[in-house]
Amino acid sequence: MATKKTFEERLQELETIVSKLESGEVPLEEAIAEFQKGMILSKDLQKTLQNAEKTLVKVMQADGSEIEIED
């Protein structure tokens, strides 16, 4: 069974995809596939960040501290 990559590993993978696409030297079909993969990674990374924020909010609230979250 494959282990899930860390946030940092997934972020690096997204950065690699972006660099590859920005180079403009990728065939169209590959560029489309890489773009789709990048979008999935981006959404996954965003979800991870949102979950981390929720966890921190819970920890802070459990501590009795007041917090203010801006959306």
Swiss-Prot record:
Pfam families noted in UniProt: Exonuc_VII_S (PF02609)
Hydrolase listed as a keyword: yes
GO biological process, one term: DNA catabolic process
GO MF annotation terms: exodeoxyribonuclease VII activity
Record bears the keyword Nuclease: yes
EC number(s) stated in the UniProt entry for this protein: 3.1.11.6
Disulphide bond pairs: none
Major enzyme class: hydrolase
Keywords per UniProt: Cytoplasm, Exonuclease, Hydrolase, Nuclease
Location(s) in or outside the cell: Cytoplasm
Range of residues in the leader sequence: none
Gene Ontology, cellular component aspect: cytosol; exodeoxyribonuclease VII complex
Catalysed reactions, semicolon-separated: Exonucleolytic cleavage in either 5'- to 3'- or 3'- to 5'-direction to yield nucleoside 5'-phosphates
InterPro entries, per database record: Exonuc_VII_S (IPR003761), Exonuc_VII_ssu_sf (IPR037004)
Subunit description: Heterooligomer composed of large and small subunits.
Homology family: Belongs to the XseB family.
Role this protein plays: Bidirectionally degrades single-stranded DNA into large acid-insoluble oligonucleotides, which are then degraded further into small acid-soluble oligonucleotides.
Name of the featured protein: Exodeoxyribonuclease 7 small subunit
Organism annotation: Streptococcus uberis (strain ATCC BAA-854 / 0140J)
Gene: xseB
